[in-house]
Amino acid sequence: MLALQEAKDSRSKKVNKIEDVKALKSPMEAFARLEEYSKNGYDSIPAEDKSYFLKCFGIFDRPATPKQFMLRVRVTGGQLSFEQAMMIGELARKFGNDYIDLTTRMQVELRYLRIEDMPTILDELKSVGISTYQTGVDNFRNILIDPLEGKSTDSVIDATPIMRRLQESFLEKPEWISVLPRKFNTSISGSMANRSNIFSQDCAFVLANKNGEWGFNLYLGGKVGKIAKSADVFLRNSDEVELAFKAIITLFRDYGFRDNRNKNRLYFLLESVGIENFAKAIRTSAQKDFLTAGINMVQVEPYENQLGRVSLKDENFAVHMVVPSGIFSGTALMDAARACNVYGNGALSISVEQNIFMLGIKSSIVEPLLKEKIFERYKNINTPYFNNVIACAGTEHCPFGVIPNKPDAIEMADYLSKKVALPNDARVRMYWSACVKGCGINGLGDFGFEGCKTKVDGKSEYGVNISIGGKLLGESEEGHSLLKSVPLIYAKYYIEELMVVYATMRQANESFEKFYERVLQFYSRASLAFFMRINAYLKHNDMKRYVLELNEKPPTLGYEKFEVFEFGRKLYKNIIGTEAYTAYQDFAPLGNQKPANLKSVEKNINENIAQIVYKMIHPDVNQRAVVFSELVEEIPYI
């Protein structure tokens, strides 16, 4: 423990402003006054309760909807019984404008709620076994689990009972409400497929095998932009998982940093002390010498969104329903619950990708179920651009949002569905976050979109930072920056260019994640960005015949200097009709030839484009471009 104490002592003794607020009272004191607030109205609520304490119970004051609240509802394991789904749906209809958001923590959020109705809403939820405790601020957030945990054929261990044990250790326990330095995200899964964004959590228990024994490897320190690292710990059973979890949360409570609010997640404690020292502290605190890590068994790619149904261990089916951007309603939730109750066991499961599974559907009645009215609005199988899309709240509902986000994600998916059709076996994960907080887990998307502001003709406009190459397989991997500050109105045209490549070159049943690994990773990201920008410009200016094409096996192997010359050579030949030089060696010209002026052949070509291409193949090596960054910003948007 010495390393942890030394790390804590090395930090500033001055706590952050939120810690000062937390010292004013206990959260239970604020919650006890909820009935009083409901009688006296919004203006009777103290500022600290609106800004912090009520959030400990999922009650969020939302400036975007003055004097109205968002309620974040904890859906344990993302699982809703028929009675629970009907209750949430009815409450949304009665009190919340019939609006529901499905979230990336497998929960629901109700909006447009008045404080006057809040006690009634909470009582009704409690009557069906639903809590909103600890769904905000410095608390234990909903534990993520596979939405098909224990049911899918790739589920080796049913971790549901373990997840419930972990939740019982803190949920609605005053001694664990608002005592952490920062929020704490947990995930556990006994499945071989990563359906729960398992590696992006503060604490993750991942299916593993050691010497023929099934259990869980422990990963720690995940957050936005960072994948959790292996703690080199193997946990053999539910007792060991619970022991380790209690040790971890106690250590984080006692030694976590409370000075800089931006650097007090578990990740920063681990960075300070080293994960090896933290793992030793876990063993000491738990008084258990846990085994070292086994083999990570998360090796299967999920496929059910593409098939619309998945066969379960009990020979029934889980039927998928696509909810674009997670925008749902109380009426729709009730309709889904009723349909599932008639055709299945009435249970619904919310996925991390903001979609819904109906459980317990017998094979003989899947087709009749799909004829129900709910599937007219929410498709069983949508296009590959919709099946796996994620989008957080955005400017309409979130004070941190920079772009609208949810409608942007839908608009792009709709555009791409029409422009670049993909077969149902394709899989493209487009994850959208409206700001840098990353609630739409954009870093893990095949394409990630992060809202920002940018300039177009000197005017401020909505924009996105675009990343590529996020991975769910193996131990997951954050995507890499591709394009910065792209005007939102043009982003779809750039993505379209890589979708054309994917549609043309992909193999049967090949996801974009696998395609990126097989083809695109051998190009530098700078070259891909240039490819997207230049092709979009050429197509939108009636010069489609000049566009670049990518090779399945690029000869340049990601070496940017070579890529610049090779792309320039191809563009020149496409425009002029002949090679710029008669001979080449190592992606450079031989001889003293001087390429022709592009505008002498194509008078309509933009002067910037002509200069860019010439610079890429310039006969003077000292004037020839060697990196794309000096070229891409000179390309007009379209």
List the predicted regions and their residue ranges.
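C-terminal lobe helix-coil module of Hanks-type protein kinase domains
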Residues: 564-638
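Short glycine-/aliphatic-rich beta-strand segments at the starts of folded cytosolic domains
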Residues: 57-78, 309-326
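Long hydrophobic segments that form regular secondary structure
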Residues: 313-317, 325-350, 501-504, 508, ...
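Mobile "lid/hinge" segments at catalytic clefts and subdomain interfaces of large enzymes
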Residues: 184-268, 448-504
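Intrinsic, low-complexity N-terminal interaction/targeting segments
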Residues: 49-64, 89, 130-133, 307-308
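Small-residue-enriched alpha-helical segments and adjacent helix-cap loops
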Residues: 42-47, 68-213, 323-459
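Intrinsic disorder at enzyme termini
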Residues: 530-559
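Terminal amphipathic helices with adjacent charged low-complexity linkers/tails
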Residues: 257-308, 365-366, 529
